[in-house]
Amino acid sequence: MNFEIWITYVATVLLLMSTPGPSQLLMLSNAATNGLRRGLFTAAGDLTANLLQMLAAGLGLAALIATSATTLAVIKWLGVAYLVFLGVKQILKARIAAPGDAPRASRKTLWMQGFITSAANPKAVVFFAALFPLFIDGALLFWPQFAILSATYLTIDGLFLTAYGASASWLARRLQGPARLWLDRIGGSFMILAAVLLGLKSLRNAS
């Protein structure tokens, strides 16, 4: 792959990620309440879903998913409902528990939250299927180029998520008492906001 094309691709991905989305908001919430090391399992779940979506795009499944409007709608709204449930649950736990006493979520739970939040946007398959061909040279082998584009995207996304998580974890360590209690509530609100963003995307795509 031409280096200039790769640099253009990197710039494009950076622009696309410049605005926080549902996965970034979830990472903020989980890293603030569970710490960065555990929060990274949320990022791992998100990246796992992204990888599967990329593979689906590379294998030519984009057209199938794009034509299955019912499947898209069901997956999206299940993801929305799941995030709302998590957000409300965290807000209620913050209200009844003493600050800092709430048990941390398991690594498996954090991974699953990240995975479901990303997988709730199955049109990502269509997005990757539309994005990658812009930077693939038809005269070269497809899969090596696909691997480079996929690895680059996952690396950039992982760095963004880690930066969000590190910032939230740093802030959480410096807040105590009532301030920490409000941080937990804000974290729950971030999850609900992530659900709202997913819902708005679904409604916008449906119109």
Label every PLM stretch briefly.
Residues 67-95, 154-164, 168, 175-207:
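Selective transmembrane alpha-helices of multi-pass membrane proteins
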Residues 92-109:
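Flexible cytoplasmic inter-helical loops of multi-pass small-molecule transporters
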Residues 114, 119-123:
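Selected transmembrane alpha-helices and immediately adjacent juxtamembrane segments
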Residues 1-4, 205-207:
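Short, strongly hydrophobic alpha-helical membrane anchors
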Residues 10, 110-114:
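C-terminal ligand-sensing/allosteric alpha-helical core of TetR-family HTH transcriptional regulators
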Residues 3-73, 128-154, 165-173:
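Juxtamembrane transmembrane-helix termini in multi-pass membrane transport proteins
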Residues 21, 121, 188:
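Short, conserved phosphate/pyrophosphate- and ester-handling motifs at nucleotide-, phospho-/glycolipid
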